[in-house]
Amino acid sequence: MSKADEKYLDIIENILENGYYDNNRTGIETYKLPHQIMQFDLSKEFPILTTKFVAFKTSVKELLWIYKDQSNDVRKLQNENVTIWDEWMLEDGTIGKAYGYQVAKFKQIDNLIDTLKTDPQSRRMLISLWNIADLKDMSLTPCCYETLWDVQNGKLNCMLVQRSGDMPLGVPFNMCQYAVLVHLIAQVTGLKPGLFTHVINNAHIYKNQIEGMKIQLKRRDKAYEAPKLWINPNIKNFYDFTADDIKLIDYKHHDKIKMEVAV
């Protein structure tokens, strides 16, 4: 069994058994738990679920849209056949001053890469998408809103802080795509990928997702080993990466589990 399946399904079981039943802004009740944490050693294994299909290529395209293209334009994703942001698209075709807009506004990727190269022991390396002044102009405030970076013995560590985690749908995307981000940043800074820690402040399962999660839990004993991540070794500039430069090798998985996203 992959570490991703093991740690993820442990949280799912905990929420279903011990979660607090609550209302929220969507109108669909949730079972939730605070402060859930998963940690993966990226030098040993790539974290993606095998107990259900995760649309890895779509998650990579979204990641590059945010951090490489530094875009808030949903139409760019649609041109890549990615529709996951359609529900939050505003009349101008964007999601407002959210996600990639904040990366570009403060040149956050450039600053991170420069610091990793010139002052890798800095304790001030972080990317924040939570700009209080612009929250009112975002169609959706960022769920994965902060990453903190650290270097130890030539390995790049990253902590992802997620304020709100839709465990069945959002979190499987986020855990693998931010692991990819660590690999990409490590490659262009001459480092090796190290620890990836995923902190979820509010980990929840919507009431209409419970049956789907029970199906996935039944697959625990039939989980597969983790696939290998391949990144084009010739890419040395972060902005040269494309989705075709990032692939999974031997990704074995169970079938997709259809569940609805709460808007």
Swiss-Prot record:
<keyword id="KW-0808">Transferase</keyword>
<comment type="pathway">
    <text>Pyrimidine metabolism; dTTP biosynthesis.</text>
</comment>
<dbReference type="GO" id="GO:0005829">
    <property type="term" value="C:cytosol"/>
</dbReference>
<feature type="binding site" description="in other chain">
    <location>
        <position position="25"/>
    </location>
    <ligand>
        <name>dUMP</name>
    </ligand>
</feature>
<dbReference type="GO" id="GO:0004799">
    <property type="term" value="F:thymidylate synthase activity"/>
</dbReference>
<protein>
    <recommendedName>
        <fullName>Thymidylate synthase</fullName>
        <ecNumber>2.1.1.45</ecNumber>
    </recommendedName>
</protein>
<feature type="binding site">
    <location>
        <begin position="123"/>
        <end position="124"/>
    </location>
    <ligand>
        <name>dUMP</name>
    </ligand>
</feature>
<keyword id="KW-0545">Nucleotide biosynthesis</keyword>
<dbReference type="GO" id="GO:0032259">
    <property type="term" value="P:methylation"/>
</dbReference>
<comment type="subunit">
    <text>Homodimer.</text>
</comment>
<dbReference type="InterPro" id="IPR045097">
    <property type="entry name" value="Thymidate_synth/dCMP_Mease"/>
</dbReference>
<dbReference type="GO" id="GO:0006231">
    <property type="term" value="P:dTMP biosynthetic process"/>
</dbReference>
<dbReference type="Pfam" id="PF00303">
    <property type="entry name" value="Thymidylat_synt"/>
</dbReference>
<feature type="binding site" description="in other chain">
    <location>
        <begin position="204"/>
        <end position="206"/>
    </location>
    <ligand>
        <name>dUMP</name>
    </ligand>
</feature>
<keyword id="KW-0963">Cytoplasm</keyword>
<dbReference type="GO" id="GO:0006235">
    <property type="term" value="P:dTTP biosynthetic process"/>
</dbReference>
<dbReference type="InterPro" id="IPR023451">
    <property type="entry name" value="Thymidate_synth/dCMP_Mease_dom"/>
</dbReference>
<dbReference type="InterPro" id="IPR000398">
    <property type="entry name" value="Thymidylate_synthase"/>
</dbReference>
<keyword id="KW-0489">Methyltransferase</keyword>
<comment type="function">
    <text>Catalyzes the reductive methylation of 2'-deoxyuridine-5'-monophosphate (dUMP) to 2'-deoxythymidine-5'-monophosphate (dTMP) while utilizing 5,10-methylenetetrahydrofolate (mTHF) as the methyl donor and reductant in the reaction, yielding dihydrofolate (DHF) as a by-product. This enzymatic reaction provides an intracellular de novo source of dTMP, an essential precursor for DNA biosynthesis.</text>
</comment>
<feature type="binding site">
    <location>
        <position position="166"/>
    </location>
    <ligand>
        <name>(6R)-5,10-methylene-5,6,7,8-tetrahydrofolate</name>
    </ligand>
</feature>
<feature type="binding site" description="in other chain">
    <location>
        <begin position="163"/>
        <end position="166"/>
    </location>
    <ligand>
        <name>dUMP</name>
    </ligand>
</feature>
<feature type="active site" description="Nucleophile">
    <location>
        <position position="143"/>
    </location>
</feature>
<comment type="similarity">
    <text>Belongs to the thymidylate synthase family. Bacterial-type ThyA subfamily.</text>
</comment>
<dbReference type="InterPro" id="IPR036926">
    <property type="entry name" value="Thymidate_synth/dCMP_Mease_sf"/>
</dbReference>
<dbReference type="InterPro" id="IPR020940">
    <property type="entry name" value="Thymidylate_synthase_AS"/>
</dbReference>
<feature type="binding site">
    <location>
        <position position="262"/>
    </location>
    <ligand>
        <name>(6R)-5,10-methylene-5,6,7,8-tetrahydrofolate</name>
    </ligand>
</feature>
<feature type="binding site" description="in other chain">
    <location>
        <position position="174"/>
    </location>
    <ligand>
        <name>dUMP</name>
    </ligand>
</feature>
